């Protein structure tokens, strides 16, 4: 085929036949056109004349349908020749114009032709097609044309997914504008296309939020909630332009929200994401949308802390984006722009005298070259594959290769080199060798760090609490770490802290069997290796103690034949026997393991390498924890409790009336037995003990011995089956459960500040309202029917309302029901008037109405001025005493906190009411070495009593003096100093608080200053001065002295 006279005649005939073709022979003629045009081309010729005529025919109403049919056939995916492709793409604007035609036949043919073109072009030539589509979408007023364009973009995503991902920066704005179109059809099509386009955002961290992000574009009212959701997201995958292009609309709107917390959270996310970006060109296209919002917020936000956070985000964005002085935005790189590559190509072709008719092919090549540059494809062979067929349209093969290679070299000179790994000199099979970044919502944890793991090695993962140890382990298990092998290549099993409560009634055997890890016989055999007997294998999981539950989770993980075992605090809830068994198993099993543990002895015994968090990198050290301390002295706090500079403080407990020394018992239990309903024997039997403000008690014993049950009875969570439990009327007990997260698991979408406000908003601790010692049961209801003889009338107590001092005890104001016809069928009890209320001594009332008395005691204690104002500042200051900064307390949802941070929150909330007795069940779980040392110091200095259940002898050896050994339901105390009265020691005096006091409604209580009583000599002197002054002034004298009246 050539542009010779003969070819021109053939093309003219085909065009003429096409213009007069009928619907019956249209396809036949169009097929002939396609065959001729796509046929073998004579070297250095192009069908320019034909396509110019075809463009005119498309615009002609009479021949448009036939011409568009010809385009559809020419652009068939099986037959489009490289020599024709540039000229077909040049027809796209004319085709787009006809998609909005009022003639339905023309419109239908144009839609078909457009779809044929976008699905037939070379994927790397997307820069030649997409600008036509986005320009039409932005400029046209025809809704049918917009719908056609949106459909074409969706088809282009399927055709060139990776190439479209690089164009998301320019695509998202025009699609967003189409989503706001007033025409319903356009709006729906735009939403569908946006959803399709976001399939190119291959970022596992945000892919589940993409529907929400799209919804935010159409419905701005969803922005605040989505900002909160993203605040608790772990960013692990590389942050690409495609990721930023879908995030920027949300963040720019978040910065413009009215609520300061949303503005603040948006600034934090911007700060966090920018830290993961090393190339300024990645953020450059988004600076004009994010920078002004941050600058404006910094100047108008009133909250100083929020302004500081905004400034931090602003500084990071300026630094990463290479923003110049005076906030001059940097120039965006144009290395991949078709205009730039066209300039390079034109300079190389200047001496070749390329005919004008080949100009479409030259421009097409520049678009392909621009895309290859954007994709960072620099190898010669790929360029030859994608570009050479188009260059041979106007050059000989050898000449085309020579010029193309020079074009490639000149065009890719500014592409940065990819990152290189520093290979370790270490023998053995690699299971993983990758570089990645890790963030958790608003906090950057790791940035472009390397992780290399060998088969059969045992690694300890060490770092401060909140540094991201558990987050990294979970990200590995969920396949969210870039470059980490998939589960098919390398089976990785994550052992959870605890087994999900939904399996409570599932038997041990069935729970493991559900994991598809083998036959029940094989599972039973393996469970027995872990210490389970036949009876335990069939019992429900709920019946297992915490230690056995952890062993079950470990057994299940081992049965999955893991290549890598991820163990997060595996010694939690395990006694020393089970820890020794686990140590031996990990050393002998030959499975690669990564262990996070706060048990320094355990890490010393099992680790061959320590992976240590240093800055935002992971660094590997050969040896165990002791070896790490020798090389990194700052890691000493992981090894020795108390070596850290971190400090905790517990609030000073309030004054207890009648307690003159720290030795006096404030809790006393006598001959107490407890048995769960339906069990064959008591869990604890015949236990007696007492606690005082000076108590420092360690409760020890094997798993399942009854330690937690004993404490539950002491704190009122359970009622004893037999025996007596006395607690001081005004005592406040802080109880942190073994599974500390139970306190907060239903409040994960609150901030820590909001949780504390919810918990104490009534003045009482809402977490304790459902305790057994506050619930009225049948026995209580029966006892409350007791009849009192008052003023000669039979009465029952209807309510207890207040309390006052009475001798060495108290008496209570009671309202009554008056009995009539007692013992008869017509017996009834009539409410009496408030004027008939009477005061009864505590001893008389407590026998039958003990729980009602306890309620009044609690309210009186709160009304005595020991209530704290639930302000943000007060809560932040209290939480700071337990190592939580204001950022986490007021601006991060509980769901986004690390395990250690959640435990600190539980400690802070539990001690909010300034308790007299702190009860900790397994406090070493989930806290890092720094926090454990700080907790140990704080408990030593605490002015109240402390009871600790723990398996960690290291934690309690310097802290506790008294030991309660629990075994088989029996408790044996040692080291105790129980006294029957006040005991010896310094006398306690009631302190007048220097701080402001508040009542239960938050009102400030102003306590008047007591006047000092004057002596008789001072009174005489004062009287003389007064009389002298009166004599001098006469009638003008006015006294303000009380003594004159």
Swiss-Prot record:
Q: What is its main location?
A: cytoplasm
Q: List the disulfide bonds.
A: none
Q: Which GO terms describe its molecular function?
A: ATP binding; ATP hydrolysis activity; RNA binding; translation elongation factor activity
Q: Where in the cell is it found?
A: Cytoplasm, Cytosol
Q: Where are the HEAT repeats?
A: 86-123, 125-162, 166-203, 171-209, 205-241, 242-279, 285-323
An example GO CC term for this entry is: cytosol
Q: Which residues lie in Basic residues bias regions? A: 1020-1031
Entry-linked SUPFAM superfamilies: ARM repeat (SSF48371), P-loop containing nucleoside triphosphate hydrolases (SSF52540)
Could you say which residues bind ADP here? Answer: 42, 44, 83, 392, 396, 703, 922, 925, 951
Task: Enumerate the spans annotated as ABC transporter domain.
Answer: 426-641, 667-993
E.C. no:
3.6.4.-
Q: Which family does it belong to?
A: Belongs to the ABC transporter superfamily. ABCF family. EF3 subfamily.
Name the record gives this protein = Elongation factor 3
Q: What organism is listed for this UniProt entry? A: Zygosaccharomyces rouxii (strain ATCC 2623 / CBS 732 / NBRC 1130 / NCYC 568 / NRRL Y-229)
């Amino acid at each position: 085929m050539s542009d010779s006279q003969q070819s021109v005649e053939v093309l003219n005939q085909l065009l003429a036949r096409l213009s007069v073709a009928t619907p019956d022979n249209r396809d036949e003629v169009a097929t002939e056109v396609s065959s001729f045009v796509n046929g073998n081309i004579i070297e250095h010729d192009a069908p320019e004349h034909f396509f110019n005529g075809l463009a005119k025919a498309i615009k002609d109403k009479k021949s448009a349908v036939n011409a568009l049919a010809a385009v559809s056939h020419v652009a068939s995916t099986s037959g489009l020749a490289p020599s024709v492709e540039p000229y077909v793409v040049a027809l796209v604007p004319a085709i787009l114009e006809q998609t909005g035609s009022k003639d339905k036949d023309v419109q239908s043919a144009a839609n078909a032709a457009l779809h044929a073109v976008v699905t037939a072009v070379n994927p790397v030539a997307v820069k030649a097609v997409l600008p036509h589509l986005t320009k039409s979408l932005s400029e046209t007023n025809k809704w049918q044309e917009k719908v056609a364009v949106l459909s074409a973009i969706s088809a282009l995503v399927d055709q060139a997914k990776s190439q479209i991902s690089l164009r998301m920066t320019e695509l998202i704005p025009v699609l967003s504008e189409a989503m706001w179109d007033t025409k319903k059809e356009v709006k729906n099509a735009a939403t569908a296309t946006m959803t399709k386009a976001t399939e190119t955002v291959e970022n596992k961290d945000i892919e589940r939020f993409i529907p929400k992000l799209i919804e935010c574009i159409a419905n701005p009212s969803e922005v605040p909630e989505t900002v909160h959701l993203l605040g608790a997201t772990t960013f692990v995958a590389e942050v690409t332009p495609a990721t930023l292009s879908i995030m920027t609309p949300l963040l720019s709107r978040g910065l413009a929200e009215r609520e300061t917390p949303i503005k603040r959270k948006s600034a934090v996310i911007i700060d966090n994401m920018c830290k993961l970006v090393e190339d300024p060109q990645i953020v450059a296209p988004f600076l004009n949308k994010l920078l002004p919002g941050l600058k404006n917020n910094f100047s108008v936000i009133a909250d100083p802390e929020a302004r500081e956070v905004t400034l931090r985000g602003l500084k990071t964005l300026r630094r990463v984006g290479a923003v110049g002085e005076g906030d001059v935005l940097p120039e965006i790189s144009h290395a991949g722009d078709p205009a730039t590559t066209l300039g390079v190509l034109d300079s190389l072709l200047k001496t070749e005298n390329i005919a004008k008719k080949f100009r479409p092919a030259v421009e097409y090549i520049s678009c392909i070259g621009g895309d290859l540059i954007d994709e960072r494809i620099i190898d010669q062979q790929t360029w030859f594959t994608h570009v050479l067929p188009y260059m041979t349209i106007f050059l000989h093969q050898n000449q085309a290769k020579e010029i193309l290679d020079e074009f490639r070299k000149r065009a890719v000179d500014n592409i940065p080199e990819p990152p290189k790994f520093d290979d370790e000199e270490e023998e053995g099979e690699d299971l993983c060798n990758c570089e990645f970044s890790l963030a958790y919502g608003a906090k950057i944890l790791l940035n472009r760090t390397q992780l290399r793991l060998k088969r059969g090695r045992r690694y300890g993962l060490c770092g401060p609490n909140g540094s991201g140890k558990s987050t990294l382990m979970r990200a590995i298990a969920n396949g969210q770490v870039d470059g980490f092998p998939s589960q098919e290549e390398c089976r990785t099993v994550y052992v959870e802290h605890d087994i999900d409560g939904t399996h409570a009634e599932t038997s041990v055997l069935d729970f493991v069997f559900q994991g598809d890890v083998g036959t029940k016989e094989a599972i039973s055999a393996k469970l027995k290796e872990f210490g389970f007997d036949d009876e335990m294998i069939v019992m429900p999981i709920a019946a297992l103690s915490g230690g056995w539950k952890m062993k079950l989770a470990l057994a299940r993980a081992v049965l999955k034949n893991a290549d890598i075992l991820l163990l997060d605090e595996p010694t939690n809830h395990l006694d020393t026997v089970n820890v020794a068994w686990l140590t031996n198993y990990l050393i002998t099993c030959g499975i690669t393991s990564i262990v996070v543990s706060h048990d320094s002895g355990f890490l010393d015994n099992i680790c061959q390498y320590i992976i240590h968090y240093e800055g935002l990198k992971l660094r590997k050290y050969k040896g165990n924890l002791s070896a790490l301390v020798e090389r990194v002295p700052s890691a000493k706090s992981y090894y020795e409790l108390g070596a850290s500079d971190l400090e905790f403080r517990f609030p000073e407990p309030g004054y207890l009336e009648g307690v003159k020394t720290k030795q006096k018992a404030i809790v006393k239990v006598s001959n107490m037995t407890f048995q769960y309903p339906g069990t064959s024997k008591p869990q604890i039997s015949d236990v007696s003990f007492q606690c005082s403000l000076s108590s420092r008690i360690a409760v020890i014993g094997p798993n399942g011995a009854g330690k937690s049950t004993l404490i539950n009875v002491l704190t009122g969570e359970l009622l004893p089956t037999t025996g007596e439990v006395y607690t001081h009327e005004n005592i406040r007990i802080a109880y942190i459960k073994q599974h500390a997260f139970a306190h907060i698991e239903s409040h994960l979408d609150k901030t820590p500040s909001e949780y504390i406000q919810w918990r104490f908003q009534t003045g009482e601790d809402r977490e304790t309202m459902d305790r057994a010692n506050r619930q009225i049961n049948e026995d209580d209801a029966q006892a409350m029917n007791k009849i009192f003889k008052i003023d000669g009338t039979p009465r029952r107590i209807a309510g207890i309302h207040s309390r006052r001092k009475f001798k060495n005890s108290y008496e209570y104001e009671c309202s009554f029901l008056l009995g009539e016809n007692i013992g008869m069928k017509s017996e009834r009890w009539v409410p009496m008037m408030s004027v008939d209320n009477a005061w009864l001594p505590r001893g008389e009332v407590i026998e039958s109405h003990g729980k009602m008395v306890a309620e009044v005691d609690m309210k009186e204690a709160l009304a005595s001025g020991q209530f704290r104002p639930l302000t943000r500042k007060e809560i932040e200051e209290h939480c700071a005493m337990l190592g939580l900064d204001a950022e986490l307390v007021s601006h991060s949802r509980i769901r986004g906190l690390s395990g250690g941070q959640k435990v600190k929150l539980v400690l802070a909330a539990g001690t909010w009411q300034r308790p007299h007795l702190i009860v900790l069940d397994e406090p070493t779980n989930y806290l890092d070495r720094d926090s454990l040392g700080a907790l140990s110091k704080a408990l030593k200095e605490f002015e109240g009593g402390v009871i600790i259940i723990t398996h960690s002898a290291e934690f309690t050896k310097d802290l506790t003096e008294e030991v309660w050994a629990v075994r088989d339901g029996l408790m044996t105390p040692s080291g105790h100093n129980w006294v029957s009265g006040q005991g010896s020691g310094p006398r306690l005096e009631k302190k007048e608080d220097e701080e402001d006091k508040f009542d239960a409604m938050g009102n400030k209580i102003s306590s008047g200053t007591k006047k000092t009583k004057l002596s008789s000599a001072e009174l005489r002197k004062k009287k003389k001065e007064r009389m002298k002054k009166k004599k001098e002034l006469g009638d003008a004298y006015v006294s303000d002295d009380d003594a004159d009246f």
